[in-house]
Amino acid sequence: MPATISRADYAAMFGPTTGDRLRLADTDLIIEVERDLTTYGEEVKFGGGKVIRDGMGQAQTTRAEGAVDTVITNALIVDHSGIYKADVGLKNGRIAKIGKAGNPDTQPGVDIIVGPGTEAIAGEGRILTAGGFDSHIHFICPQQIEDALHSGLTTMLGGGTGPAHGTLATTCTPGPWHIGRMLQAADAFPMNLAFAGKGNASLPAALEEQVLGGACALKLHEDWGTTPAAIDCCLSVADAMDVQVMIHTDTLNESGFVENTVAAMKGRTIHAFHTEGAGGGHAPDIIKICGEEHVLPSSTNPTRPFTVNTLEEHLDMLMVCHHLDKSIPEDVAFAESRIRRETIAAEDILHDMGAFSIIASDSQAMGRVGEVLIRTWQTADKMRKQRGRLAEETGDNDNFRVRRYIAKYTINPAIAHGIGHEIGSIEEGKRADLVLWNPAFFGVKPEMVLLGGTIVMAQMGDPNASIPTPQPVYSRPMFGAYGRSVENCAVTFVSAAAHEDGIGARLGLAKETLAVTNTRNIGKSHLILNNATPQIEVNPETYEVRADGELLTCQPAEVLPMAQRYFLF
């Protein structure tokens, strides 16, 4: 006879199931489980007196015969593709199967075989997401990588050589020599890393040698001179060598206006950084380009979301980051021209509409590397409070909005940079770069981070305690973050040209190198749940922003979730 159990008791034992709802952290965002791929009455769970025991939920199957390396049981998957419950099997550092785990000799419907060689991670009552991808990194100091990992990021792309003044302002690793040194340094870190070369040149040779030297992208930055000629040259090299171009346009409008920049692009794909403009770009109307099909628009996190403190903190940030002098009137005017409450307010709404597609940090250069996820969900919560439910929602939940926002730091930057076939979502065959969350701490403090199927970070108590939970409990590096394991759980992304030329062997790299691909034959329409292309107009006198004729404005937030209450310890 089948047993009956209350929803509350079931959720407490096996985690929420179809129709159950839960809150994300302390936000107003409510998600609902859409479907459950496990089987009622046949759930697998590890522990004393539980299911994953020899001859019960654990089969005799060897690894060679098909048993997985790791099973994450009864996890609530939150992904751009949906919000659903499943067991997840990991093998060879990748997601082998999403479905029902157990012993096929004793249980029906098993498609993830648990064997004697299988480790178990309890996903009951936990949320599982893909690792985050920050595509706007200034590699100013290596300590950023630890902060990023402990926030739920597993991939970082950007440029720099350390605290050189070029790196303090621009995300470029200039020249093949510097790129080589950064690729060699990448071997030491439990993080997927990728580097952008300097794209500012009017002739192609110096750009081509950087791509061949391992750069997987090229960055055009106004501090190096983002002229129409440089834009055209950089995009031509990118088209020929299949790498993405990121652009920070000309704030001062010295070499042209936004229309001249768009004309120089000639409809070619480009990733536009901080498209609102506070982080840099044609003043006051760079935000217009988010309506172009060939532009992949992103935000950096200091303007996310618009709050009562946003404008004030930006001026000082800008003066430091761009090597400006408060005693020079022109420098002050340059800084003030970039900070506009009207365009920052509009940016909130454009994200909620799906017209801005990506959120990244701009680490230590007008951005906070450990706050990509927090700022994304704070924006989603602010828009939920101010704009209500999205028209696309189909139930008494915020599932569509949550899927839209998680895509901004997972699958969309991955697609934009040619690595969406490897990372960015929870899909069979992709790398097992995964983050496990307690729902109460979602987006703030991960419970566990896996990189290539290996645990690299987790919340951990006193190492001298008799059990792992006594205080102080905080995120600490795990075994995957040490020794030779680092070389095998993380990868380095490079251009196809460098990969085919044997960049790994040439530089003696220990980490596997993977080539980026298909960065050029894409447009905004390829970005998931964030591909709206409204006609944007900016009033040059008032800075008011309109999308398809509708004024975009909202009030700054005075209080945010996922903030001080989470950082008392």
Curated annotation (Swiss-Prot):
Keywords: Cytoplasm, Hydrolase, Metal-binding, Nickel. CDD domains: Urease_alpha. The keyword Membrane does not apply. Its cofactor is Ni cation. It is found in: Cytoplasm. Pathway: Nitrogen metabolism; urea degradation; CO(2) and NH(3) from urea (urease route): step 1/1. Ni(2+) 2 binds at K219, H248, H274. It catalyses: urea + 2 H2O + H(+) = hydrogencarbonate + 2 NH4(+). Its EC number is 3.5.1.5. Substrate binds at H221. The keyword Acyltransferase does not apply. One of its GO terms (biological process) is urea catabolic process. Heterotrimer of UreA (gamma), UreB (beta) and UreC (alpha) subunits. Three heterotrimers associate to form the active enzyme. This is Urease subunit alpha. The gene is ureC.
